[in-house]
Amino acid sequence: MTEEKNEVIFDDDKISKSEEFVNPDELYQELIQCVQKYHPSDDISMIEKAYKVASEAHKNQFRKSGEPYIIHPLNVAIILADLKLDKETIVAGILHDVVEDTVMTEEDLRREFGDDVALLVDGVTKLEKIPLSGSNGEQSDAKLEMQAENLRKMFLAMAKDIRVIMIKLADRLHNMRTLKYQSKEAQQRIARETQEIYCPIAQRLGISKIKIELEDLSLKYLEPEAYYDLVEKVALRKNVRDSYVQGLVADVRREIEEAG
């Protein structure tokens, strides 16, 4: 079972509803603004339709944070838009969980959004069924790495369209960003999966932006002491660099004033 499936909590389940989440409509506007930066003349009607359909399909579902579930696919779509992907991929990102977690079918998607979007969502749904966990801790490192490599190859082979992998990476990235709401055991399992499967795939595809953030978030849960030590060192270097730049600017300004 994947962490995505565990995230779906229905309205009648006992959860503490968070009061500190972003309004879905505000997230949607952020998505549209992001898309229009690189596709200013693009017709957004299909994206708007996908948002309405996904909102209705997920309306009684919540994440473990207490947020409405629609927050997740919207964030996935924003990550994809930040990578400047095409409109069909953005739409599939918004709809990527509706077949697995709601009553909607692939046929429904094909009828409403066309073959391209339906095939992308179907590809993501199939990837989510690959069992990524379950390695025996007593096996050698070489054996575990071979198993991880086999999983990576299976993952890539099953995705007939590279955009399916992009959606899955965006899906995993947002789940990693919100991993604090999972149990400690789930945090370790998901972070390990991310480190062993998703980070190498992102590296192979040359998506350094996602790879780096996935690595950082994995380290945060697998080796928290090392992670926070690194964060502290980076912050210290930034402060030193900022002080140097500010001093340099002040020197230049003073020289200009003296020369003027």
Locate the predicted segments by residue.
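Active-site helical microenvironments for divalent-metal-assisted chemistry
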Residues: 1-260
